[in-house]
């Protein structure tokens, strides 16, 4: 967190990542929710928690209730790592919001529904045409809850900037295959500023 949003109290940011596989027909999609994190203030660094292997499932279930668990947004089952042959084969879009009284899971569902419709109506669109449309439609979907009226006793979640594409290069894939690569996106808006780090690895 670089600049927090709330004038009183701490932020509760969350991240939505949309992952699209352009090699399948029809193109496949998943939207993954990370967070919200609690009690976030300017200057603090918060991360996802990597669950150790072979933990009993009851313990895993408890950890998921109290921590933001590290979940892979690729492959699209949120469980199994998947190889990326070329950067052009995938599209990764990310957005950051700060929770007030909204429901992050509802925002995730809105984004997934909107992007599913975009992919269905643009089956033959080339990547350079499709990506701007996906970004526009993801922003439009998130505007629905974020621009709801503030009723005093209920406040909508705040968007931190707009949707950004996590662009991969061939070098990123080579580094990830050899070990780990990291990418960053900076989200800046009237309601705060956040830097989000992404880990690329054979298995997160």
Describe the predicted segments one by one:
Residues 1-204:
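N-terminal amphipathic/basic membrane-interacting segments and domains
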């Amino acid at each position: 967190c670089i600049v927090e949003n709330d004038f009183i109290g701490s932020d509760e940011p969350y991240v939505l990542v949309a992952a699209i596989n352009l090699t399948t027909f029809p193109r496949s999609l998943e939207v993954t929710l990370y967070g919200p994190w609690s009690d976030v203030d300017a200057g603090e660094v918060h991360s996802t928690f990597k669950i150790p292997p072979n933990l009993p499932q009851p313990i895993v279930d408890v950890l998921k209730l109290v921590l933001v668990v590290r979940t892979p947004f690729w492959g699209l089952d949120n469980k199994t790592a998947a190889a990326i042959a070329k950067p052009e084969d995938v599209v990764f879009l990310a957005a950051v919001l700060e929770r007030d009284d909204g429901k992050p899971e509802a925002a995730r569902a809105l984004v997934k529904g909107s992007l599913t419709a975009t992919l269905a109506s643009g089956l033959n669109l080339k990547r350079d045409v499709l990506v701007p449309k996906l970004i526009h439609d993801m922003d439009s979907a998130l505007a629905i809850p974020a621009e709801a009226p503030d009723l005093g006793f209920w406040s909508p979640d705040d968007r931190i900037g707009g949707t950004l594409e996590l662009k991969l290069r061939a070098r990123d894939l080579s580094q990830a295959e050899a070990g780990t690569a990291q990418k960053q996106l900076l989200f800046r808006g009237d309601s705060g500023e956040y830097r989000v780090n992404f880990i690329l690895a054979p298995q997160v």
